[in-house]
Design a protein with these regions (language model features):
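Catalytic palm active-site di-aspartate
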Residues: 1-5, 152-155, 223-224, 317-330
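Conserved "right-hand" nucleotidyltransferase catalytic core of DNA-directed polymerases
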Residues: 1-137, 143, 147-149, 188, ...
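Short, contiguous acidic/charged loop-to-helix segments that flank catalytic cores in large enzymes
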Residues: 74, 97-105, 137-142, 152, ...
Length: 409
């Protein structure tokens, strides 16, 4: 894919020189680092206490609160403060991020970083050598060449559609077709009126979104209760909501349990096209690891089938990213190529699961790739500091500078 080479070169040249200034700006709300960018464990302890997480936060053998990536990832989806904290730690450790392999034609080709079929579900293995596997703000280095646009085509709530169709759960399929699965589930649970929307009942929707996504990954009520504590939900209340969720979509959960039982008895589980997962004889199997396997694996089958269709239709595919494709289109052909690409993806879904109705979202990037707003803000902040540094050096005419070179991100 095409990369913004001037911006990449600026980052490589000036990042180490502006890193502390970026950290200070990000720290203005958290106030956990001093002017020398030294971390305060006592202030961090106060923050975790304020968030009411002291009883759940993992500690080191010496009794200190852990500050590693894995610990932050337990809480960052539910606490904005932890997400920002994780982002700062990532930047502090980034004297050198993963290398971009830039070819002679100034395009990025991830030799060794892109690993299809790397997981037991047949999905790609995440890798920091792959631009979509490293820091999300770095995606802003992706830039279409002159006269082109980059288009991200994403299967909308793909796993919900697959689960509804292959399990035969009509209620789940109706919720998917409503356009807002989380809100419709809240309505079915009696927690929102029939005319409720994302705008009128945002908190209720967030609660059910958390329950749905956590259940997809085999999480129980205790884990969900941690995430829903900020909505003043107790463990007992969350357990009740989880039970209600399983009652609403009873057909799906009965089917998923039957698939899990079959795998444990026979020692294997398969997709419709024959991607298998086999289990060693007489070795205990974690049932939770099987609950979402059929859905995830069928999603992988759809993605691969869609990729074949896109390439046969002469669509320029730059990347596959979980449930989406990044394609490059010439501007005069943009709308037509998007139409063809969407149809290829929809046809792939129909072919694999045997039912129509899969939806595809489209994002068009005519300039640099736009990640989530928080990640875009971070990218902008980094380059604001780089521009300030470059301007200050121009004003200091007699001063010689020796920029720290960083080979890549």
């Amino acid at each position: 894919m095409s990369i913004d080479i001037p911006k990449l070169n600026d980052f490589n040249e000036y990042w180490l020189l502006v890193k502390n200034e970026v950290i200070k700006k990000l720290n203005s709300e958290l106030n956990l680092w001093d002017d020398a960018c030294k971390f305060s464990h006592s202030k961090f302890h106060q923050l975790i206490k304020k968030l009411d997480l002291l009883g759940e936060w993992p500690t080191t053998p010496m009794g200190k609160l852990k500050t590693n990536k894995e610990t932050f990832e337990l809480f960052d989806d539910y606490y904005p403060e932890i997400k920002k904290l994780k982002r700062i730690f990532n930047l502090l450790n980034a004297s050198k991020l993963t290398e971009f392999a830039i070819s002679e034609d100034a395009r990025y080709r991830p030799y060794g970083g892109y690993k299809p079929f790397g997981t037991h579900t047949g999905r790609c293995t995440p890798s920091s050598k792959w631009i979509f596997g490293t820091a999300k703000w770095a995606r802003s280095f992706i830039k279409p060449p002159f006269g082109c646009a980059m288009v991200n085509l994403d299967f909308k709530s793909q796993e919900t559609f697959i689960a509804a169709v292959i399990s035969g759960d009509e209620k789940m399929l109706a919720s998917y077709k409503s356009g807002d699965f989380y809100m419709n589930t809240a309505i079915l649970a009696g927690m929102a009126p029939t005319d409720a929307t994302k705008e009128t009942h945002p908190e209720i929707r967030k609660i059910w979104k958390t329950i749905v996504l956590a259940t997809n990954y085999g999480q129980g009520a205790r884990g969900m209760a941690k995430a829903l504590k900020k909505f003043n939900k107790t463990y007992s209340e969350v357990a009740g909501l989880l039970m209600k969720y399983k009652e609403i979509y009873k057909t799906y959960f009965d089917w998923a349990e039957a698939k899990s039982n079959h795998a444990q008895v026979h020692g294997y589980i398969s997709t419709s096209l024959g991607w298998d997962r086999h289990f060693p004889y007489a070795v205990p199997i974690n049932p939770r690891s099987l609950m979402n396997w059929p859905v995830q694996s069928e999603a992988g089958e759809i993605l691969r089938n869609a990729l074949i269709r896109l390439l046969n239709a002469n669509i320029k595919v730059c990347a596959t990213v979980h449930d989406s494709f990044l394609i490059e289109c010439q501007l005069p052909e943009l709308n037509e190529q998007i139409r063809i690409a969407k149809q290829c993806m929809i046809d792939a879904g129909t072919y694999i699961v045997g039912a129509e109705g899969m939806q595809v979202d489209v994002e068009i990037h005519r300039g640099n790739f736009k990640p989530e707003p928080a990640d875009q803000e971070l990218f902008n902040l980094i380059f604001e500091e780089i521009e300030k540094y470059k301007t200050s050096q121009k004003l200091n005419q007699g001063q010689v500078t020796y920029p720290n070179k960083v080979r890549s991100i």
